[in-house]
Amino acid sequence: MKTLYTAVSTAHGGRDGHVRSSDGIVDLDLRTPKEMGGPGGAGTNPEQLFASGYAACFESAMRVVARKQKLPLADASVTGHVSFNVTEQGKYVLSVELHGKVEGVSHEEAEALMRAAHEVCPYSNATRGNIEVKLVAE
């Protein structure tokens, strides 16, 4: 395996702390959402960061697949929904829904494009077999 890029971030204080990337571009306060018993308020959380990263990566994968398949992709967007869940056994797990909007192709083509992107997206490859990921073409 050949490494093309490595991102580095450091977190302090857990869900109610701070996260900063090595280059300082990401420099964010973290807050546990009220829904999870935290203070909420100004600050992000790991689920929002994961949803943002997965959505951006997946949309890029859709563009790569569309280019290879010569699909006319006028415009596209992906919205990531990352849920923090607890199983009946008390285990904490994430689940993901990716909602894709694709201009210039039929609904069936959009679904096929999302399925193909799911096979090449690095986030999809990392999560496959580990968490539930649902694809929704809108």
Which residue ranges define each predicted feature?
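Extended beta-strand/beta-hairpin segments
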Residues: 1-52, 59-138
